[in-house]
Design a protein with these regions (language model features):
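Bacterial N-terminal signal peptides that target proteins for export
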Residues: 2-10
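C-terminal motif of bacterial Sec signal peptides marking the signal peptidase cleavage site
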Residues: 19-22
């Protein structure tokens, strides 16, 4: 019964600097929008900091699961000990997930301020670039919400799995059926992860395009 784990790190939005000296922005609102959009980056700093610890914990838990699968049921005491270790890791993963969610929510709050400024833009070319940018970010937030939901569901199923493994009388068929369902959930997590990273890459690209269209003198 192999178990599926995602090991991809979620990509964060990138900070971009520009030189105020010699800035040839067509509108002051572009400079104001820049300031707020870069606050969105800062709001996601904690989100970014959760990625490597989460992946490390996922790998650690996978190793524990493999150790359990290598043991016979006669070694029940060792299985219980390893399952408890895995349950502790699941709690840590849940803590990191909550910090990630909180950080994305802070990002949303800042982004709403940016939307108010965007609506003040008069230049049609800038407006088109900004509209594209904001549509991508709204989709990104939507995908992360779904991703977090699926990941939380996977954590619940992970917990159930190790509780089942601690039960000496659990049948192989029940374990196998549970692992199959769990892997289906993790496939959903993986798919949402991929979509989120793609949207983040698009957002970072469109943000640069907007800054250039607005005449902001970007730092190299």
């Amino acid at each position: 019964m192999s178990i599926f784990r995602i090991t991809n790190i979620l990509v964060s939005v990138l900070a971009v600097g520009f030189l105020l000296t010699g800035c040839v922005s067509k509108e002051k609102s572009a400079e104001r929008l820049y300031q707020v959009l870069e606050k969105v980056v800062k709001a996601e700093k904690e989100f970014e900091e959760q990625q490597e610890p989460l992946v490390a914990l996922e790998k650690e838990e996978k190793e524990i699961y493999n150790q359990i699968m290598a043991l016979g049921m006669k070694q029940h005491e060792e299985i219980v000990k390893l399952s408890d270790d895995a349950l502790s890791i699941i709690d840590k993963r849940r803590d990191h997930l909550q910090k990630e969610i909180d950080s994305i929510n802070d990002s949303k709050t800042e982004f709403k301020k940016a939307e108010e400024i965007k609506n003040e833009i008069k230049d049609s070319a800038q407006k088109r670039k900004a509209d594209d940018l904001f549509e991508i970010m709204r989709n990104r937030y939507k995908v992360h919400k779904q991703l977090a939901k699926e990941y939380s569901s996977a954590l619940d199923s992970d917990k159930d799995l190790y509780l089942m493994l601690k039960n000496e009388s659990i049948s192989y068929d029940k374990l196998e059926a549970h692992v199959t369902r769990l892997n289906t959930t993790y496939q959903k997590v993986y798919d949402a992860n991929e979509e989120f990273n793609e949207l983040t890459a698009q957002y970072n690209e469109k943000k640069l395009e907007f800054y250039k269209e607005a005449g902001l003198n970007l730092e190299k």
